[in-house]
Amino acid sequence: MKKLLVVLLPTLLAGCSYYDAMVERMNTDTLEYRCDEKPLTVSLNKQREQVSFVLDDKMLHLNQGRAASGTRYTDGIYAFWSKGDEATVYHRDNIVLNHCQLQNPKR
């Protein structure tokens, strides 16, 4: 019985890991923006209410916050604000990426 458990337990744990990764991918959209001729790839995790993207060789993970209009994500230093097919990225309230237009939006 112990030998069977030793063999099956890693398989069961691997299956759980695979399931978690699959659910994570299902809840994540990849959004491609063009910001003043610069590309910006944003991963939107709907379950975590979080966006992730690379800016200046740094991976940023921003959590959804309050917004009067549109959707805003922030970590207290950086902010990603989007409304419709447009977005803006801020660093300490200064615009660092502007005129970001969503490419090939889903309708």
Swiss-Prot record:
It comes from the Bacteria. A lipid is attached at C16 (S-diacylglycerol cysteine). GO terms for cellular component: cell outer membrane. It is found in: Cell outer membrane. Keywords: Cell outer membrane, Disulfide bond, Lipoprotein, Membrane, Palmitate, Signal. It is a lipid-anchor. Pfam families: MliC. InterPro entries: MliC (IPR018660), MliC_sf (IPR036328). The record marks S69, K83 as: Directly involved in lysozyme active site inhibition. Residues 1-15 form the signal peptide. Disulfide bonds join C35-C100. A lipid is attached at C16 (N-palmitoyl cysteine). SUPFAM superfamilies: YdhA-like. Specifically inhibits C-type lysozymes. Monomer. Belongs to the MliC family. Type 1 subfamily. NCBIfam families: PRK11372.1 (NF008475). This is Membrane-bound lysozyme inhibitor of C-type lysozyme. It comes from Cronobacter sakazakii (strain ATCC BAA-894) (Enterobacter sakazakii). The gene is mliC.
